[in-house]
Amino acid sequence: MNKFFKNILIISLTFVLLLSILIIGILWNYSNNIPDYKFLKNYKPPVSSKVYSGDGELVADFSQEKRIFVPFNSIPKNVINAFLSAEDKNFFSHPGVDAKGVLRAFINNITNIITAKRLEGASTITQQVAKNFLLTNEISLNRKIKEAILAFRIERALSKERILELYLNQIYLGSGAYGVAAASLEYFDKSIRDLNYSEAALLAALPKAPSRYNPYRDIELAKFRRNL
């Protein structure tokens, strides 16, 4: 190996080493400044406060948020599959962050920027749990790094089923409804046990933009989003 290529190799290895040290330092710094996530293991979201008459008729609902907690084992498979299909197809195989999804979104967003189209996200369901429970909606690299670190840690601490349970009971689906059970009653006036796949798919279409795709606002747009 001549001297020129030897110098190039030394410079390249030095650059890679320094870059690795920088990245490790940044991640270490963020890792020591993220919220505590361990409470999620036993967390149950607040539910609606309702008053019923003697014959079982709903008299009053004192909560601003419509929410009904449903354990994972009581959530129908068609509802789970609809949300996985719409939000995170690789949920059961990734470790919290979907590298393939990030790469795909990066490539697609190059075209989207050129054509002035809406940018794609690449957040997994676990990342959404991290954001919804522990972070803000701030759009920044700072938040995305924390979100990714939290997602990896949450995946190590909780089962996939528990993460899905948290997500499906916490996600905002428009019209004041939080979680799939409350949204099922709000939009279809039925229990999630009675939802058909088309109805489940419509609910799964809402997380990206609950107001825009709200079926009360524009049923055709909601169906269009459902069918994507």
What are these regions (language model features)?
Residues I21-N32, L103-F106, I110-I114, F133, ...:
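Structural signature of transmembrane alpha-helix termini at the membrane-water interface
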Residues M1-Y52, N90-F91:
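N-terminal type II signal-anchor transmembrane helix
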Residues L58, R67, K89-F91, N109, ...:
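Solvent-exposed loop/turn segments at secondary-structure junctions
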Residues P71-I125, Y178-F188, L195-S198:
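Flexible, acidic/glycine-enriched loop-and-adjacent beta/alpha segments
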Residues N42-I68:
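Short extracytoplasmic
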Residues I34-Y37, S63-F72, A86, A148:
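N-terminal post-signal-peptidase region of extra-cytosolic proteins
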Residues I23, A116-L228:
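Non-catalytic, structured segments within soluble enzyme domains
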Residues N42-Y43, F62-S63, P95-K100, L141-K144:
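Short, glycine-/polar-rich solvent-exposed loops and beta-turns at beta-strand/coil boundaries
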